[in-house]
Amino acid sequence: MSDFIASKEDDYSKWYLDIVQKAKLADYSPVKGCMVIMPYGYSIWSKIQSILDKKFKETGHENAYFPMLIPYSFLEREKDHIDGFSPEFAIIKDAGGESLAEPLVLRPTSETIIWNMYSKWIKSYRDLPLKINQWANVVRWEKRTRPFLRTTEFLWQEGHTAHATEEEALEETLLILDVYKRFIEDYLAIPVFCGKKSEKEKFAGAVSTYSIEALMQDKKALQAATSHYLGLNFAKAFDVKFQDKDGKMRHVFASSWGVSTRLIGALIMVHSDEKGLVLPPRIAPIEIIVIPIFKKEDEINKKILDYCDCVVDALKKAGFRVEIDKDVRSSPGFRFSSAEFKGIPIRLEVGINDVLLNSVTISRRDKDRKFKYQISLDSLVSKVKVELDLMQKDLFQRALNFRILNTKEIFRSSKDSYETFKAYVNDYSGFVLSCWCGSLNCENIIKNETKATIRCIPDDFKARDLTGMTCIYCSSKAKYFVLFAKSY
């Protein structure tokens, strides 16, 4: 175990915070509950942005930007929306030395101000669909905060679309859910469950919410992304109508969806270890770090550095994201640890013997420190590609194996009861697949007694037969298979 990072088993929360700080991802700001995202942390967010932005544009979305200041009256137009968010509002009542005629809310989410603009922009069926994405910051006055996972201010993207039909809006909602799922699994190497939220857990103002749920190493769930079908709620609140092909005026159907810097928290908690951050290659800002092993003689060191420059050039020409650590003041061990803290997937060591043999020594961040071997310069590009691809797959498989191991099925039977369910959730956590009757009362009691919530009605188990199945709490006829878990 590193002398600088707490043990996961002894203090999971401190382990997480140690990695955030030691990997220089973020620091605490003077404002309570806010964080400063440091350059390395922001570079991860930039990678997330660039990949998702491309995917949004491929699916017909355009970027725009809407004001951070929202008139309070806008939020009052959708009752469920304001009821859900009002405890988290940050409100400005004075500006320029005077009291404002109307309070302004710092953006908690942008449905209201965007739909106010849509009422001006949408008049005809020719204006639809309207598919806009925004990269922005959000302010929600959280009581209990933790860097990346839950902060007063955070960065996110939010998509807002308008459609002529319910079918189109639902299709959009599920399309984006799939975009998120593929991104999180293919790039972040995090296996996820997708499914519909219960009425209790859905987004304030939505008809239905679909979420993506991942399991962290402490066996708590984390909601990684959401996609909402809004129906006509916001169109009616802001009187957004269009003239259809028959000349009739109709309200517009809507969706909204988003992910945030919380994904960085998920990366940390799914993959990292007691040596520091572990980043999947496809999302790592730096895929490869080249570390020269210096000697005392300047002439030898010049040969090593010249050789390292050739290695870096070859890798950059092949399209890899690579850097070299030329810090002559620090020992190789210190520089190895620094690369481990930052989670850089591949480390290439170059000593004078490597120069003489026309080779480099390669190691992988997700492997034991004893895992290293020499490769020739001729095979450098192909070998590095193989190891990066293997690491991406191995990280996903390791996380999937962990989730499988910590997903338990507990149903009412002669062997198992609600007490079995409750004892398991309280003692072991993880995901529990069980049955639910759809009653809010049962959902509330389970949450109060176990702190576990219904994470989603998972798509993975839709095909399973509910015949004869009963609610884990009340034993009434079951309507759904659901995933329970304690969560962030």
UniProtKB/Swiss-Prot annotation:
It comes from the Bacteria. Its EC number is 6.1.1.15. InterPro entries: aa-tRNA-synt_IIb, aa-tRNA-synth_II, aa-tRNA-synth_II/BPL/LPL, Anticodon-bd, Anticodon-bd_dom_sf, Pro-tRNA-ligase_IIa, Pro-tRNA-ligase_IIa_arc-type, Pro-tRNA_ligase_II_C. GO terms for cellular component: aminoacyl-tRNA synthetase multienzyme complex; cytoplasm. Transmembrane segments: none annotated. Its main location: cytoplasm. It catalyses: tRNA(Pro) + L-proline + ATP = L-prolyl-tRNA(Pro) + AMP + diphosphate. It is found in: Cytoplasm. PANTHER family: BIFUNCTIONAL GLUTAMATE_PROLINE--TRNA LIGASE, PROLYL-TRNA SYNTHETASE. Consists of three domains: the N-terminal catalytic domain, the anticodon-binding domain and the C-terminal extension. NCBIfam families: proS_fam_I. Belongs to the class-II aminoacyl-tRNA synthetase family. ProS type 3 subfamily. Homodimer. This is Proline--tRNA ligase. It comes from Borreliella burgdorferi (strain ZS7) (Borrelia burgdorferi).
